[in-house]
Amino acid sequence: MQLKHLRTLLSPQDGAAKVTCMAWSQNNAKFAVCTVDRVVLLYDEHGERRDKFSTKPADMKYGRKSYMVKGMAFSPDSTKIAIGQTDNIIYVYKIGEDWGDKKVICNKFIQTSAVTCLQWPAEYVIVFGLAEGKVRLANTKTNKSSTIYGTESYVVALTTNCSGKGILSGHADGTIVRYFFDDEGSGESQGKLVNHPCPPYALAWATNSIVAAGCDRRIVAYGKEGHVLQTFDYSRDPQEREFTTAAASPGGQSVVLGSYDRLRVFNWSPRRSIWEEAKPKEIANLYTVTALAWKRDGSRLCAGTLCGGVEQFDCCLRRSIYKNKFELTYVGPSQVIVKNLSSGTRVVLKSHYGYEVEEVKILGKERYLVAHTSDTLLLGDLNTNRLSEIAWQGSGGNEKYFFENENVCMIFNAGELTLVEYGSNDSLGSVRTEFMNPHLISVRINERCQRGMEDNKKLAYLVDIKTIAIVDLIGGYNIGTISHESRVDWLELNETGHKLLFRDRKLRLHLYDIESCSKTMILNFCSYVQWVPGSDVLVAQNRNSLCVWYNIEAPERVTMSSIRGDVVGLERGGGKTEVMVTEGVTTVAYTLDEGLIEFGTAIDDGNYTRATAFLETLEMTPETEAMWKTLSKLALEARQLHTAERCFSALGHVAKARFLHETNEIADQVSREYGGEGTDFYQVRARLAMLEKNYKLAEMIFLEQNAVEEAMDMYQELHRWEECIAVAEAKGHPALEKLRRDYYQWLMDTQQEERAGELQESQGDGLAAISLYLKAGLPAKAARLVLTREELLANTELVEHITTALIKGELYERAGDLFEKIRNPQRALECYCKGNAFMKAVELARLAFPVEVVRLEEAWGDHLVQQKQLDAAINHYIEARCSIKAIEAALGARQWKKAIYILDLQDRNTASKYYPRVAQHYASLQEYEIAEELYTKGDRTKDAIDMYTQAGRWEQAHKLAMKCMRPEDVSVLYITQAQEMEKQGKYREAERLYVTVEEPDLAITMFKKHKLYDDMIRLVGKHHPDLLSDTHLHLGKELEAEGRLQEAEYHYLEAQEWKATVNMYRSSGLWEEAYRVAKAHGGANAHKHVAYLWAKSLGGEAAVRLLNKLGLLEATIDHAADNCSFEFAFELSRLAFKHKAPEIHLKYAMYLEDEGKFEEAEAEFIRAGKPKEAVLMFVHNQDWEAAQRVAEAHDPDSVAEVLVGQARGALEEKDFQKAEGLLLRAQRPGLALNYYKEAGLWSDALRICKDYVPGQLEALQEEYEREATKKGGRGVEGLVEQARQWEQAGEYSRAVDCYLKVRDSGSSGLMEKCWMKAAELSIKFLPPQRSLEVVRVVGPQLIGIGKHSAAAELYLNLDLVKEAIDAFIEGEEWNKAKRVAKELDPRYEDYVDQHYKEFLKNQGKVDSLVGVDVVAALDLYVEQGQWDKCIETATKQNYKILHKYVALYATHLIREGGYAQALALYVQHGAPANPQNFNIYKRIFTDMVSSPGTNNAEAYHSWADLRDVLFNLCENLVKSSEANSAAHEEFEMMLLISHYYATRSAAQSIKQLETVAARLSVSLLRHTQLLPADKAFYEAGTAAKEVGWENMAFIFLNRFLDLTDAIEEGTLDALDHSDFQDTDIPFEVPLPAKQHVPEAQREEVRDWVLTVSMDQRLEQVLPRDERGVYEASLVAASTGVRALPCLITGYPILRNKIEFKRPGKAANKDNWNKFLMAIKTSHSPVCQDVLKFISQWCGGLPSTSFSFQ
């Protein structure tokens, strides 16, 4: 360590002004200096002077300079300073935590001599030395001081060890004494340790030794037991003077001694175990060092001098900067200061064992410290300043550190996991595991304290991939092991360590309860899971569902909600918990129920104060009330009475709250007076017992304390007089008689005649008691009393009076007893019979009326049957000789033997129908013989056979069956038995059974199933010889598949399928077997093909050798070529048969030609010496160029043939010129001539003949003339030519006739030209009549070939306007037609328009038709189903047209089930008051109210649309002739209903309006004539159930179930209306045609209703209001007065009415204000829309500051 001067804190003076003492505070923030003036100066850690205060003398009369301060020390909490003074006193000053706080003396300790030195090592403990030689202890808590030990020598120095647990004092005689408060297990001795040569004014206690020095200028280091380790002798150094003071570093690794102008520094070397002197710090004019103080973190040393100066030095071995963020200052070998450069915070890292710190790392997001020493590992949390040091043997730096848990560091090394809790110097534990993944390890360290559990530390980790172990880290033992069937990929304990969650590779989530060791799968697909921080609430994701378990103790109760993305995290703060979900690019927060989370957690932890604080932040709702009740119960159980009082106050239980308040006052007073727990006081315990209605316990508590009066007062206050009197009797209380009188008087005053009668009876006054009993309506008690007293029986009037009362009260048995007692048997018997007291009646009848006994026995039996006592009834029926009833009773009572006994006594007809019932019982007991006998007696032998069949007793069944069954039934029986035999492996027996019943196919199937093929073939051959071959083939395939080839061969060959056998062996590579089979069974060439395939598989010379061996080489070459395996054929020919190559080339060429590979084929043809074949190939494919190239190169004789072929192709393409040239090149003009003739091209034929074959010219001309004559001389060209000749000759009429005769279907242009020419000639040169005829002929012909314009032009030339227009129309040239009509004959304009409309209609060109005829266009749109275009077009027309088509479209949509789109139409276009539209509006309303999924907040806009349309309709009706009609009233009612639905949807979007929504659902029940009744009652019932109105919910849901049954039955006749008497809920409603609620929800309701009715905790009555009628009824049944319904809830307005401008419209003020408040707090747009509508509907809102903006 080196000292570096930093600054001068206090400048020295010119003379002696000694700094007497100095001290650093424990928290390193304050430094105190006491000057010679007895003033304490206070500095901050940076050396700035911040404060000062003066010390005071023990007694002011001696003056301020009467003492010196000799010792000073800070308290461990750094808020106090102890000052030791020479005037025999120690003062303790409280200086506070902040600068400038007032300095107050809080302790003072007066001593018998001067204080010479002082230390404050521990809380409340100040150690100081006195001039008289004593070392004493001052306790600041008790303000007393005591002597630790005493010597006879002045105490010159006092110091402590590093931990402050030991003290060392130096005395003037050189003695050094050691004392331990706690030796920390070191075993070091106490007492006098060493005798130093001089007074050890400089005394320091380092880690490994004690350093002492004094005026002899020697420094001596002593060992732990006082032996000298080292001596540093400076006595011969003239520069050195005496050593005045010494200080050890806080780490104990360095010592500094002060002398004159010099500070000497010694450092301990751990490796050499000796002190090494560093270079001394010499400062001129420093003078004598009088005081030294070392900062607690070891980074600063301050020295005070004789002249009053204070110098500050920096102490450092070395410094380094870590990642430019932290400064590491090594102030000693075992101590490092880590400073955060950005925040300035510092942490002191120190080895408590003095080991040298080797390296410091800052890991885990720069929060955690890790440092190694030779034998330990240092860990720390920079944020919380929690540091740990554990024993750690060097492992080569291979450790892996995980800092995911804020409380624990996880260290993984060589397969071992070690856990270290920050702030603890022992490892929590270590386990073996190979899985070091933070997701596979979970540690919980006191994360959530629970009541009664102080320490809770648990670890869960993977032992292997499928095994989880759970360890209690406190006890170090295993508390659970979970073996799972698949790999675990995530696990985590809850914060209390009671539950473990884990997920496996199949994404299944499991919950393990550590206490019960039970494992539950709670989710079958889990992509995200996390515990909610600070609770046991669990959040997980299952595909598109968010799952929340608010109560993990009930894992089956999960709250699920739909989400559209992936959960990415949880955020908890600000009083809410949110689940963050990414939906696309956005993150959406889903809020959890904070009440369930916070309250549940507080209750689980037993933190009732936290639970109370949370509940006080909530509004009082049914849920909150339930929480208060739970808390009140738990608080009482835990005796937290103030919490319980608060709970009952919140619940409005005033009496209980007041009672607890008084109890708390008693407990608090007792606690104040006597201390301890006030709840243990007897009055408190008794009052708590009273609160729990345990009055006996309260009495016991009072009597234990002899508080008899208090016990009696308690009972009297509770009006429990009997108990009060019993206490008085037990304790002999003097007021006993008075109590009894008061009790009787009280009973009479409170009309408790029964109790008064009992009191009189107990006191012996019978008449008075009877009188009181009768007065109380208790004649039975009176009768009992009379029967016990003979003297009272004698009083006939009294007895008559009593019997009359008994009969009136239907107490017939007691009346009978009385009549029998007074000897009136007739009346007694009547009473017994009426009271069903048959035993007494029969006994009386036997004595008095024997004839009646039989009748009474039967009646007795009937009564017992009604009471379900069938067993008892049997004997009575036998006595009454009622056999049938006796049998029925015996059967009902399951008295089978009695039943058989009775049956055996009856005739056969009577007994036969009962025997089977008894037989069934014995069959169920497997007593088959008895059952058979009974079935037989009852003529039910078939049932006996069925019994034996079901029991597997086939022999008995068969024996019976043969007696009574048909053959087909026996067959079924046998087959069943055979199947049973087959299951048992008895195949032969099964076969015999199958064959016996002529079912051999079943036997065949059985043998096949069990692979007994020989038996199978045997049966097929015997029973199905025609299928034998197919069976062999099928078996062969199966055996081949199983690899049983020899057996397969047998079956294939038996099936004559040798090819299948060959293929089987081939595919298995057994070629010899294949060849053998082919040769033996395959005919002449089969073995050759197999040989070819075998050889091909071998290839090369091996193939040649094989084929030579088989003698099939040449044949195989041919076979290969024939099978297109040319490569193999060439290979074989090359190796053995070269002369076969041309033949193979030719076959190959032909193959290539077939494949279309002509160039390759050409080469092969040439190689085969067949060029002619190549030429023919190309000619065939008309590749003339290639054909000519090959012919010229290899076969010149074929050139002419190629040219002729090419010419033929040209002729086929009508290219006569090219064909002519080719034929002439081939020197074949004759062929050209023939081709022209065949084509009818006589002119070309004549030309060719003339040029190349002139000798044939004459004959050709003759032939041509013959042809012309055959065709009538009128070929097209001939006609045209003839026409031209007539025209040139001036014969225009004949020319016209010729032109008109031209018909050439191939040339419309020629025909047009000719016909136009004819018309032109006729107009120019022929008479008008003739020209008109020609034009009338030409016009239609031109139109026929599509030349409409030309025809029209012709017609116009002759003024044929209509014909011209018709031509344009037919040519669809409408503009020209219109122009002609307009310009030449306007009469035809309408004619053109009409045709144009028809054209557009026929063509479907509606867009064009719109401009001509809108209505026709709209109708066409409707026909085509183009509704959108129809409505869009109609919108541009008048209102009437628009709504005609809107109605048509709406009707269409409704038929298609699209009521929502129909509604949207009327939202867009308005709802006119047309009567013909009324059914549409009603249908939309009906469909909307019947549709599912509309009872939620999301349906608001649909309901609002319906409401707005009906409002618009009603407004229009008011202005129409339909105003105030029945239809108008009906639509007004529909408007009100739709307003209720819309308001309900709006209210469902806000939590605080849930009761409003429920009330609206209830109000809608009065409109069930217009709504589906089952849906309305279901919605009302579920809404009532959700808000806790269980009575209403039960009645409505019960009604709903009745309605669903009525729908099933198709009638409402069975409905019970008693629950709805005196309400406005209608009885007569339309029966819904179908169920509107799904089956699953109906069953859920059925279960709930059944559960509630079984509990019998609800009263089946609708709630009533102040009118005494059902609270939601508008009509008061008693008065008939009808209240207005509230616009917000639909409930009747009885008071606090807010009226609107529109008559009949009002709201309840409370509901209205609640609705407004909800809008203001939530800013809900839908609720604002409701208000906006109410404003429109009701003519404005009441005066309010609410705004829609």
Swiss-Prot record:
Source organism (scientific name): Mus musculus
Family of the protein in this entry: Belongs to the IFT172 family.
Assembly mode: Interacts with IFT88. Interacts with IFT57. Interacts with RABL2/RABL2A; binds preferentially to GDP-bound RABL2.
Modification Omega-N-methylarginine, positions: R672
Cross-link for Glycyl lysine isopeptide (Lys-Gly) (interchain with G-Cter in SUMO1), residue positions: K4
Compartments in which it is found: Cell projection, Cilium
SMART domains named in the record: WD40
Coiled coil: none
One Gene Ontology term, aspect cellular component: sperm midpiece
Repeat region (WD), residues: 14-53, 64-103, 110-148, 150-191, 195-233, 238-278, 284-323, 483-520, 521-559
GO BP term, example: protein processing
Purpose: Required for the maintenance and formation of cilia. Plays an indirect role in hedgehog (Hh) signaling, cilia being required for all activity of the hedgehog pathway.
Lineage: Eukaryota, Metazoa, Chordata, Craniata, Vertebrata
TPR repeats: 593-624, 692-725, 809-842, 854-887, 912-945, 947-970, 971-1004, 1042-1075, 1142-1175, 1276-1309, 1345-1378, 1411-1445, 1447-1477, 1574-1607
Keywords from the UniProt entry: Acetylation, Cell projection, Cilium, Developmental protein, Isopeptide bond, Methylation, Repeat, TPR repeat, Ubl conjugation, WD repeat
Modified residues (N-acetylmethionine): M1
Tissue note: Co-localizes with RABL2/RABL2A in the midpiece of elongated spermatids within the testis (at protein level). Expressed in the flagellum of elongated spermatids and sperm in the testis lumen (at protein level).
Variant or mutagenesis effect after changing L1564P: In wim; embryos arrest at 10.5-11.5 dpc and display an open neural tube in the head that lack the normal groove on the ventral midline
The name this protein goes by in its record: Intraflagellar transport protein 172 homolog
